[in-house]
Every structure is written in structure tokens, then in C-alpha cells.
């Protein structure tokens, strides 16, 4: 896909829930969405406590507004640790189930080429990553809602159960440069190896699965 990096001279919208979310038309995002049981509550609370202490010590009221130096430290200290918690394999890990993973993949690919362009993506046992470029005037939040809502319906139906499947708030990061894009591509492609997985994952690019193990 044609990559357009974040442009600081172009209007940017930042909204915040528990995490900051940057939005700018025409850019690419690194998205991580996790299952509701993927991080135990006590570990999630500890992560948030340490993050809030760091923000207070750095006199930062909003992590969406950081200097470049502080942003790099923030991602080292908290973004990386957040992903380490996911890779620890907590929870039921239903996406290691071939049928459940396939239903999520179908939802990821449903809008590819129309509502958005998918670059590299990876289905892990309790979360997934994707590099995605929304089409013009298609909000990223709407894309993620379709992914989560559709796959939740399909997977719950397959497993014959009800209830929340996904954690409410996803993690997304606006890609700022070609170098960062390549970094995220490598991270996604290597995530199964980093997590020590030999089965139960799928790595793809666009509409094609590049590496499938255990499915």
C-alpha cells in the first residue's frame, strides 16, 4: 500500500479514553486489540499505576502530548511492557482455535481494498495486530468496531456462548515515518517467535496468509 506518514502540519484529532488516540486522515496505524481475559486485572492495574506515576514524575497530564524524547521513553517503558503482558499467554487464548482465528481473519479481510488497506497482520492466541490505512472519510474507530463486533458475534456463535469477547479499548499508534513502518512490520511478523509460539498463530499481509501454524 502507498504509505503516508503522520504530518505534524496537518490537522490532527486526539481523543482519550484510558489511552490516547491520534487521528489524521490518510495515515497508517498500528492497531492491537486483545481479548477481554488476555491480561489479568491485577497486572493491568499495576501497569496503569506505574504509568500514572511516570506521567506524574514527568509533569505530563496527557500522554498524547509528549516531547519526542519522552515519547520514546514512554513506549519503551509502557507500550513494550503492555505487549509483553499479552505475549505471556494469559486467559483462555481462544484465537489459537483454528475456527475462531479463521472467523476473525474473515472479518479483517472483509473491508480490505474498500474501506481500508491492510498491510501486515498477525493473529495471536489472545490478541491481534494489524497495520491498516483507512480509506478517505472512514474513521479508524469504525473499522475496529466492525472487526470486533463481527468477530465477537461469529466466534460466540461458533462456541455457543454469549458475553464480551474483546477488551473494550484497543491500542493504536499513528505511524510517523517509513522507518517506524518497517519497525512495526518486523514486530508483527516476528511476534509469534518473540512469544515462543510454535503453533496457534497466523501471519498475513493484505489478503494473503504468509505463515500459518497450528491452523
Language-model segments: what does each one mean?
Residues 1-215:
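Short catalytic/metal-binding and nucleic-acid-binding patches
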Amino acid at each position: 500500500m502507498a504509505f503516508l506518514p503522520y504530518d505534524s502540519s496537518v490537522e490532527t484529532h486526539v481523543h482519550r479514553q484510558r489511552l490516547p488516540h491520534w487521528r489524521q486522515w490518510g495515515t497508517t496505524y498500528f492497531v492491537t486489540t486483545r481479548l477481554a481475559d488476555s491480561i489479568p486485572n491485577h497486572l493491568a492495574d499495576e501497569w496503569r499505576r506505574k504509568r500514572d506515576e511516570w506521567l506524574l514524575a514527568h509533569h505530563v497530564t496527557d500522554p498524547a502530548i509528549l516531547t519526542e524524547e519522552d515519547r520514546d521513553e514512554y513506549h519503551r517503558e509502557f507500550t513494550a511492557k503492555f505487549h509483553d503482558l499479552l505475549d505471556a499467554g494469559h486467559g483462555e487464548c481462544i484465537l489459537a482455535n483454528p475456527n475462531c482465528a479463521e472467523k476473525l481473519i474473515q472479518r479483517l479481510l472483509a473491508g480490505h481494498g474498500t474501506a481500508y488497506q491492510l498491510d501486515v497482520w498477525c493473529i495471536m492466541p489472545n490478541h491481534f495486530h494489524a497495520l491498516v490505512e483507512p480509506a478517505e472519510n472512514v474513521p479508524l474507530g469504525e473499522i475496529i468496531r466492525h472487526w470486533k463486533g463481527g468477530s465477537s458475534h461469529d466466534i460466540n456463535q461458533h462456541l455457543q456462548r454469549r458475553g464480551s469477547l474483546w477488551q473494550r479499548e484497543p491500542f493504536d499508534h499513528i505511524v510517523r515515518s517509513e522507518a517506524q513502518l518497517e519497525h512495526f512490520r518486523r514486530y508483527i511478523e516476528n511476534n509469534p517467535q518473540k512469544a515462543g509460539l510454535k503453533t496457534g498463530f497466523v501471519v498475513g499481509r493484505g489478503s494473503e496468509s504468509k505463515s500459518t501454524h497450528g491452523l
